[in-house]
Amino acid sequence: MINIRKTHPLMKILNDAFIDLPTPSNISSWWNFGSLLGLCLIMQILTGLFLAMHYTPDTSTAFSSVAHICRDVNYGWFIRYLHANGASMFFICLYAHIGRGLYYGSYMFQETWNIGVLLLLTVMATAFVGYVLPWGQMSFWGATVITNLLSAIPYIGTTLVEWIWGGFSVDKATLTRFFAFHFILPFIITALAAVHLLFLHETGSNNPTGIPSNMDMIPFHPYYTIKDILGALFLILALLALTLFAPDLLGDPDNYTPANPLSTPAHIKPEWYFLFAYAILRSIPNKLGGVLALLLSILILIFIPMLQTSKQRSMMFRPFSQLLFWTLIADLLTLTWIGGQPVEHPYIIVGQLASILYFFLILVLMPTVSLIENKLLKW
């Protein structure tokens, strides 16, 4: 009998991607985050779609429409908080996924890695424009501060900012276009994710050892489908716990005050997942320098494959590199903490030191230590 799964043009694509895909037999739970990101994306698109049915992208009614969703729409509060906290889960999975790639040398699949960096930037853009939509105080001032950074670009900066705003300040036109961007970007992310997967399946997955696993592959289904389902259950459990018990834990109380251009909040700060980059931005006293550092803090990921000096792909057997990797994680956590603190002593100097350490670790220390490890192994 002919198996339709292997012959039908559409089923064949799905089969080769999720069922008969040869997968290394030793990949750990750190490889779960790819599928979890897919799950997050689907959840965000679905909850977002239902929110868009009731939301109005107009400065006079946006805040009220979000209140209306929470009060009057059936399970509207649940959909809204699933969407808001779903974004946090998305970024947790995203950072874990990138961390896994850095630790195990997955960045050596350069096409996959570069599409991944592009995906990160697109998700960050989506989260930023989405945060503006409830039109609370932090929405308005966050949009004002972050879009204003573009004015640091020489010559065209001011014109560019006014072009993005659609006027001379963040107003009705800005909110409308941000809603349009927030609606379209997830579909672009979906397309990019498909390309990301396409490139990955050209090479096959990496594994914790970093050694080619062509001679030891197992089918994706049932081994990793069941493992992914377990991961998905944990993710959903965490998301539901957050949404039902502490929906506002990760949010900002200022966003429950309607946007007011005449009153600036005491501390303007983005959502927690952008705080590390915000801390790097603030650590440089010069506007253009800060913007460049902010950009480089993310775009530095593109250069990681070029900074690989070790003759081993993974950090599994490299204790000194492991130490530096976890120092980098600690540094990023420090930056995240600093980003949420007011601009005063001692936070300023701690932020500056953490920012310097971030770039020094990636650009200097890690490549140097990799070379030393090669020497120690007489390679």
From Swiss-Prot:
Entry binding sites for a ubiquinone: 201
Membrane-protein topology: Multi-pass membrane protein
Binding site for heme b b562: 83, 182
One cellular component term from this protein's GO annotations in UniProt: mitochondrial inner membrane
Entry keywords, A to Z: Electron transport, Heme, Iron, Membrane, Metal-binding, Mitochondrion, Mitochondrion inner membrane, Respiratory chain, Transmembrane, Transmembrane helix, Transport, Ubiquinone
Keyword Zinc-finger: no
Residue numbers binding heme b b566: 97, 196
GO molecular function: metal ion binding; ubiquinol-cytochrome-c reductase activity
Principal subcellular localization: mitochondrion
Heme found in the keyword field: yes
Superkingdom classification of source: Eukaryota
Cofactor binding, per record: Binds 2 heme b groups non-covalently.
InterPro entries: Cyt_b/b6_C (IPR005798), Cyt_b/b6_C_sf (IPR036150), Cyt_b/b6_N (IPR005797), Cytb/b6-like_sf (IPR027387), Cytochrome_b (IPR030689), Cytochrome_b_C_euk/bac (IPR048260), Cytochrome_b_N_euk/bac (IPR048259), Di-haem_cyt_TM (IPR016174)
Cofactor(s) needed: heme b
Subcellular location: Mitochondrion inner membrane
Entry's transmembrane regions: 33-53, 77-98, 113-133, 178-198, 226-246, 288-308, 320-340, 347-367
SUPFAM superfamilies assigned: a domain/subunit of cytochrome bc1 complex (Ubiquinol-cytochrome c reductase) (SSF81648), Transmembrane di-heme cytochromes (SSF81342)
GO terms classed as biological process: mitochondrial electron transport, ubiquinol to cytochrome c
Family: Belongs to the cytochrome b family.
Function: Component of the ubiquinol-cytochrome c reductase complex (complex III or cytochrome b-c1 complex) that is part of the mitochondrial respiratory chain. The b-c1 complex mediates electron transfer from ubiquinol to cytochrome c. Contributes to the generation of a proton gradient across the mitochondrial membrane that is then used for ATP synthesis.
Subunit structure: The cytochrome bc1 complex contains 11 subunits: 3 respiratory subunits (MT-CYB, CYC1 and UQCRFS1), 2 core proteins (UQCRC1 and UQCRC2) and 6 low-molecular weight proteins (UQCRH/QCR6, UQCRB/QCR7, UQCRQ/QCR8, UQCR10/QCR9, UQCR11/QCR10 and a cleavage product of UQCRFS1). This cytochrome bc1 complex then forms a dimer.
Note: Heme 1 (or BL or b562) is low-potential and absorbs at about 562 nm, and heme 2 (or BH or b566) is high-potential and absorbs at about 566 nm.
Name of the featured protein: Cytochrome b
Source organism per UniProt: Cephalorhynchus heavisidii (Heaviside's dolphin)
Organism lineage: Eukaryota, Metazoa, Chordata, Craniata, Vertebrata
